[in-house]
From Swiss-Prot:
GO cellular component entries: mitochondrial inner membrane; respiratory chain complex IV
Pathway of action: Energy metabolism; oxidative phosphorylation
Function: Component of the cytochrome c oxidase, the last enzyme in the mitochondrial electron transport chain which drives oxidative phosphorylation. The respiratory chain contains 3 multisubunit complexes succinate dehydrogenase (complex II, CII), ubiquinol-cytochrome c oxidoreductase (cytochrome b-c1 complex, complex III, CIII) and cytochrome c oxidase (complex IV, CIV), that cooperate to transfer electrons derived from NADH and succinate to molecular oxygen, creating an electrochemical gradient over the inner membrane that drives transmembrane transport and the ATP synthase.
Organism superkingdom: Eukaryota
Membrane spanning residue stretches: 12-40, 51-86, 95-117, 141-170, 183-212, 228-261, 270-286, 299-327, 336-357, 371-400, 407-433, 447-478
Organism this protein belongs to: Heterogeomys hispidus (Hispid pocket gopher)
Protein name: Cytochrome c oxidase subunit 1
UniProt-annotated binding residues for O2: Y244
Residues that bind heme a3: H376
Subcellular localization: Mitochondrion inner membrane
Gene behind this protein: MT-CO1
Residues involved in Cu cation binding: H240, H290, H291
E.C. code: 7.1.1.9
């Protein structure tokens, strides 16, 4: 019974739950690694050892947070749980493939951890650039294990993407068009398209790196007519869409949360929101070289990538102002989920502004590989993606479990987290402007003050993570059941009660034509 339900599951709700639990545990690992980083940087001098072990920790922190925390929770967890419920489908289009997508992740995670355990570990940064990732600078199996880990995670995501695209296009009730599906469904579909188009390029790049390392090919070795810059193009053609993959489902969740707690029946500017997401998805593929402004590209190339990158601010602005317009005139309920959503809008916008700064190729020459870049992407990830996950979690927790979280604890948790992440990452803008480089385990004494404050902030965030564990325990221990949910007419996922039955929509949903 237990094995049939959890190991061989074909139920989108159970698989979504598995993704959530896996992502939560991976998030603990990623948090631990981030605490190691900030402990090392809390004061000048050495704590862990040399830069190799430090860079192994930094690399693992990135991979764990991206591939095993944010993506499994947002796409695998929320996506699996909510998409079929929101479109009135009985399950995903390919339920067994769905199960395989999940079970590819634990082996992938194991391979990543194994890469740290053998030889000296993969101290390459998450970009895995050759020649540092070649078989001279990184002799041994570490980088190879990392590459295999990425292959498995990539296959998992590609299969998941195929599944979501098929489900969303094919399993709606015949009466409704794509433009009547909720924004979260749209966000997952666009994310899936991005995954489907970008991951094969990453797979090609890291496979070439694998053969360069082991089979004596020279794709990225100038001695044999190769070019390490080719690797950078291949990696970033995946890497830039990837950062939009990490944030787009968050956009979808924030739209739902803001609409719900503003007491509105629909988000402001639905079509504008959809087109904005599609524009972001398209533009995300044609700006990749802004990560490479320092490798010596032609001035006209730099001009193009600068302007193209700035254009992405327009659809992003459409989304931000539409969220504000949704709030406008609403009967606002200051629930914990709403606090996360408001925090998201504010902090994501700050991250977007520093992104506009970095898009200037001339400025980026100075700021590239400094802590300014670290501050920028942690504002959009640690306060964008993670805030969206937390908001979605506290909003849909009653749907997933049937129990309610304690409102007061949830608000305290938000406050601690808000203070912690801002104290961690705001000072890093100053460090970057002062020229402190990334990926070094030590620094000149001049940078001590802001680094110490930053490290203190990370420990505040750690207490927030611990409080969250307590909060979830408290909810399950207290067993406060959900009586009823308001606004189900425009929030289809809630109509089956909390939690919904094992099988939902066994008959096709009936859609009234008046809507």
């Amino acid at each position: 019974m237990f094995i049939n339900r959890w190991l061989f599951s074909t139920n989108h709700k159970d698989i979504g739950t598995l993704y959530m639990i896996f992502g939560a545990w991976a998030g603990m690992v990623g948090t631990g690694l981030s605490i190691l980083i900030r402990a090392e940087l809390g004061q000048p001098g050495s704590l862990l050892g040399d830069d190799q072990i430090y860079n192994v920790v930094v690399t693992a922190h990135a991979f764990v947070m991206i591939f095993f925390m944010v993506m499994p929770i947002m796409i695998g967890g929320f996506g699996n749980w909510l998409v079929p419920l929101m479109i009135g489908a009985p399950d995903m289009a390919f339920p067994r493939m769905n199960n395989m997508s999940f079970w590819l992740l634990p082996p992938s995670f194991f391979l990543l951890l194994a890469s740290s355990m053998v030889e000296a570990g993969a101290g390459t940064g998450w970009t895995v650039y050759p020649p540092l990732a070649g078989n001279l600078a990184h002799a041994g199996a570490s980088v190879d294990l990392t590459i295999f880990s990425l292959h498995l995670a990539g296959v998992s995501s590609i299969l998941g993407a195929i599944n979501f695209i098929t489900t969303i296009i094919n399993m709606k009730p015949p009466a409704i068009t794509q433009y009547q599906t909720p924004l979260f469904v749209w966000s997952v579909m666009i994310t899936a398209v991005l995954l489907l188009l970008s991951l094969p390029v990453l797979a090609a790049g890291i496979t070439m790196l694998l053969t360069d390392r082991n089979l004596n090919t020279t794709f990225f070795d100038p001695a044999g007519g190769g070019d390490p810059i080719l690797y950078q193009h291949l990696f970033w053609f995946f890497g830039h869409p990837e950062v939009y993959i990490l944030i787009l489902p968050g956009f979808g969740m924030i739209s739902h949360i803001v609409t719900y707690y503003s007491g509105k029946k629909e988000p402001f500017g639905y079509m504008g929101m959809v087109w904005a997401m599609m524009s972001i998805g398209f533009l995300g593929f044609i700006v990749w070289a802004h990560h490479m402004f320092t490798v010596g590209m032609d001035v006209d190339t730099r001009a193009y990538f600068t302007s193209a990158t700035m254009i992405i601010a327009i659809p992003t602005g459409v989304k931000v102002f539409s969220w504000l317009a949704t709030l406008h005139g609403g009967n606002i309920k200051w629930s914990p989920a709403m606090l996360w959503a408001l925090g998201f809008i504010f902090l994501f916008t700050i991250g977007g502004l520093t992104g506009i700064v970095l898009s200037n190729s001339s400025l980026d020459i100075v700021l590239h590989d400094t802590y300014y870049v670290v501050a920028h992407f942690h504002y959009v990830l640690s306060m964008g993606a993670v805030f969206a996950i937390m908001g979605g979690f506290v909003h849909w927790f009653p749907l997933f479990t049937g129990y309610t979280l304690n409102d007061t604890w949830a608000k305290i948790h938000f406050t601690i987290m808000f203070v912690g992440v801002n104290m961690t990452f705001f000072p890093q803008h100053f460090l970057g402007l002062a020229g402190m480089p990334r990926r070094y385990s030590d620094y000149p004494d001049a940078y001590t003050t802001w680094n110490t404050i930053s490290s203190m902030g990370s420990f505040i965030s750690l207490t927030a993570v611990i409080l969250m564990v307590f909060m979830i325990w408290e909810a399950f221990a207290s067993k406060r059941v959900v009586k009823s949910v308001s606004l189900t007419s425009t929030n289809l996922e809630w109509i089956h009660g909390c939690p919904p039955p094992f099988h939902t929509f066994e008959e096709p949903a009936f859609i009234k034509s008046s809507h």
